[in-house]
Amino acid sequence: MAPRPLHELVEAGWAKALDPVAGRIAAMGDFLRAEVAAGRTYLPAGANVLRAFQQPFDDVRVLIVGQDPYPTPGMAIGLSFAVSPEVRSLPGSLENIFRELHTDLGLPRPSNGDLTPWTEQGVLLLNRALTTAPRKPAAHRGKGWEEVTEQAIRALVARGTPLVSVLWGRDARNLRPLLGDLPAIESAHPSPMSADRGFFGSRPFSRANELLVRQGAQPVDWRLP
């Protein structure tokens, strides 16, 4: 991530929303450059670290919170739960998301794990930590990204426009107090270790659309190619 002004790194609405933590974002850029200088790398690739904030701030109507990027090289693309379209063996969490998508809405299994079409529908796929080290899950948690992503959520809430949050797992549910009176769908994480404890059968996609319509917003078209 090059040392560039925030407005050159993210969409204009996000640049304004994240201005209170611009210093923290710059510090995280310094941290990542220091990692590279020390012979260590990070995921996702630099151009994708802030990718979640490249979709229009004002268009976000659903927030899906993840933990941190997939640590397997070649998978993470800067959107929570999504992987590069070239990835053939999908992570277990994503397989379970697709299974629930079919159960909930009857949609066929997508051809790949790239969730970019959801972002074009106003779905923000946001990890709490935006980077990690290769093959080291949660390596960059507690380094400062949480300050950035929590500010992002506060800014979304402050808009006063329709928003539904989908909180999978304890880490995501810990963000519930930031959401005020806005609706949230909470369940177990889609990980194979926990999906049977409340994720399967939770119908997050249809419920999100129901909650959007109640707020006067258009539902999301959850279909993926």
Curated annotation (Swiss-Prot):
Signal peptide feature range: none
Swiss-Prot/TrEMBL GO biological process terms: base-excision repair, AP site formation via deaminated base removal
Record has Cytoplasm as a keyword: yes
Enzyme Commission number(s) of this protein: 3.2.2.27
Gene3D superfamilies: Uracil-DNA glycosylase-like domain
InterPro entries tied to this protein: UDG_fam1, Ura-DNA_Glyclase_AS, Uracil-DNA_glycosylase-like, Uracil-DNA_glycosylase-like_sf
Keywords, comma-separated and alphabetical: Cytoplasm, DNA damage, DNA repair, Hydrolase
Top-level taxon: Bacteria
GO molecular function, one term: uracil DNA N-glycosylase activity
Catalytic activity: Hydrolyzes single-stranded DNA or mismatched double-stranded DNA and polynucleotides, releasing free uracil
GO cellular component: cytoplasm
Enzyme class of the recorded protein, top EC level: hydrolase
Entry annotation: catalytic residues: 68 (proton acceptor)
Cytoplasm recorded as keyword: yes
Subcellular location: Cytoplasm
Similarity comment: Belongs to the uracil-DNA glycosylase (UDG) superfamily. UNG family.
Role this protein plays: Excises uracil residues from the DNA which can arise as a result of misincorporation of dUMP residues by DNA polymerase or due to deamination of cytosine.
HAMAP family: UDG
Listed name of the protein: Uracil-DNA glycosylase 1
Organism: Streptomyces avermitilis (strain ATCC 31267 / DSM 46492 / JCM 5070 / NBRC 14893 / NCIMB 12804 / NRRL 8165 / MA-4680)
Gene assigned in the entry: ung1
